[in-house]
Amino acid sequence: MEVDFSNSSKEEIRFFYQTISHNVKKYRLEKGLSQEKIALDIGIKSIAFYSNCENNRYDKHFNLEHLYKISKSLDIDLSLLLKR
């Protein structure tokens, strides 16, 4: 029997990542920037990887360093990317 010691369900974590992905895309589109522009700004050479993170595909997601750099590239407060 597997014991789960986590204080968050898998669904909560999935929703958390979806929220971040949604916010990144929303603010990027508001600024009129391409995925390629942001990916290159934050040092990601694979546009496909960036796209997978932004669209929450294949269990790919941004890490904290990515989010920090994205917030700088978009000239927004980092907390906006985390809000529900």
Language-model-detected regions and their locations in the chain:
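Short C-terminal boundary/hinge segments that cap the last helix of small helical domains
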Residues: L74-R84
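Conserved hydrophobic/aromatic packing and binding residues within compact polymer-binding modules
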Residues: V24, I38-A39, F49-C53, L81
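A short, Lys/Arg-rich alpha-helix, primarily the initiator
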Residues: E2-E30
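The alpha-helix within a helix-turn-helix
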Residues: R28, A39, S71
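Short, basic-rich loop-to-helix N-cap that marks the start of a DNA-contacting helix
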Residues: G32, R57-K72
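Recognition helix of helix-turn-helix/homeodomain-like DNA-binding domains
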Residues: I44-K60
